[in-house]
C-alpha cells in the first residue's frame, strides 16, 4: 500500500520501522503476546475432528495438519441424509397475542413436548383447537420461559455439494430468509400459499385455521406405496390437516404419494404424502418394504405450517363479536439440524417466512495439508501477509456420509468453571479427577491428539486474534495417556496434602475455634490503647485552640 504524498521507498522503510517497533514491544512485554484461550465450545469439535480421518480415510489419520477456521460466521453445511427428513422431529411453539387481559393470562410462550401424551387425550387434531382445549379444561402445558432463537446463526455458510431436497416458499410479503442457488438443490418442493381457511366451532369459540398449501411441481409422479395405500398411522389424529380424528380400527384413508427423484440410490426412495403433508423414507431392499419411523411434526410440515392463525369469540346474547387473541405457529429444529437458506442458517422458522431452504448439519471450516509441509506461523504485522498454504478442504478427503454421521452427535463443549481455581484444594482435586475421567472416555473415540501443545497454543492465540486458521498436528504418541496419569497423580497429591494439612495442629480450622473467643474482646482494647492517646491529644488541642480564639476575639 502506498501512502499519499510519499514514495514507495519511504513507505517500505516506514513499514519496516513499525514492524521492528512492534516486535520490540512484543519481546519487551511478553504479556502482549500471550495466546488467547480456546473457546470452550470448540473443545469437542477439535477432538471430533481428530477422529474423522480415521473413520473415513486412514491415510489422514496421522502425519497431517488439520486446520480449523476460528471465524464465528464461516461454516460448512453438510446435507442431511434422506432418513433425517422423515425421522427428525421439530418442536412446536405457539405464541399467543391477547387482546382481552381479563379473560386470559398475559402473553406467554407455550411449548408442546408431546401432543400425543395421555395427560391430554381430548386435544383436537388442530393446533389452535388444542390450545383452546388446554385453557378450557384447565390443563397445565409446559411453559417455556426462553423464547426460540430467531434470526441467522451464521451468515457465511457454504454448501460444497448439492442438497438432495430443498423447500421453497415464495410470496410477495413475508420475512425473507434467503434463497439457495438452484444448482445446489437436486430437487425443490415449491409450496403454494393457501387462499382459504378452515372454520371450526368449539363451545363459544370459532376458529379460523389456515388451510394446507399445495405443492407446485411437474417432476413428481404418483407411486404405489404402503403409505399411499392408506397405512394405519398411530399419530393420524394428531396431524393438523386431517378433517377428523381417526382411530386404529377405522377404515384406512386413501392418500396419494409423490416420488422425489433419487438417482444416487434406487433401493431407497423419498415419498411426499400430500394428504398428511409428510415425507416418508422407504427402504426397498427387503420384501417387507421397511418404513422408517415417522415423526408427527417434520421439517416439511413445519415449513408449511409456519403462519398466523386467528381465533374469534362467537356471537352470543351476553357478548359481542371480538378478537380475544391470535396464534402464531413457530417451529424449531432439534437433534443438531439447521435450516440453510441462502448463506444463512436458522434453528427456527419465523411465521410468514419466504425463501428456499434445506436441512443441513454445520461444521467449522476444516482443511488439511500434508504433514511434511511446513506451515508458516502468522505474524502480527500492520499489513496482512499473503500466505500460500497448500490446504485442501476436508470434505474432499472425507466421505459426506461419514462426516454427516459423525456430526450428527452435535457440538458440545468441555469447560471448567473459573470458580474451580478459587475453591479449596479438595474441590480443585475433584475437578482435576473429573477432567482426567473425561479425557479417558474421549480417548476411546479419538485416535490421536495434538502432541505439540505449546507450539499449537502460541499459534492458536494469534489465530484467534487475527481470525485465521488454526492447525493441529496429528500423531499417535500416547501423550494423552501420560497427561492423564499426571493429572491423576496430581489430584492424589493435592488430596493427600489437603488431608494432611487438615489433620495437622497448624490447620486453621483446628485452633481458630478457641482463639477467636479470646481475641474478640482483646482486639477492641488493643485498638483503644493504640489510638486512644492520639485521639485524646487531638481533641484537647482542638478545644484549646477554640478557647484561645474566643478569648482573643473578646479582648
From Swiss-Prot:
Orthologs in P.troglodytes, G.gorilla (truncated) and P.pygmaeus (truncated). HERV-H family subgenomic RNAs have been observed. The chain crosses the membrane at residues 516-536. It comes from the Eukaryota. InterPro entries: TLV/ENV_coat_polyprotein. Low expression in testis. The surface (SU) and transmembrane (TM) proteins form a heterodimer. SU and TM are attached by noncovalent interactions or by a labile interchain disulfide bond. Residues 36-515 are extracellular. It is found in: Virion. GO terms for cellular component: plasma membrane. A motif (CXXC) lies at residues 64-67. Glycans are attached at residues 47, 222, 265, 283, 352, 370, 475. This is HERV-H_2q24.1 provirus ancestral Env polyprotein. Residues 388-408 are annotated as: Fusion peptide. Keywords: Cell membrane, Cleavage on pair of basic residues, Disulfide bond, ERV, Glycoprotein, Membrane, Signal, Transmembrane, Transmembrane helix, Transposable element, Viral envelope protein, Virion. Retroviral envelope proteins mediate receptor recognition and membrane fusion during early infection. Endogenous envelope proteins may have kept, lost or modified their original function during evolution. This endogenous envelope protein has lost its original fusogenic properties. SU mediates receptor recognition. Residues 537-555 are cytoplasmic. The record marks 387-388 as: Cleavage.
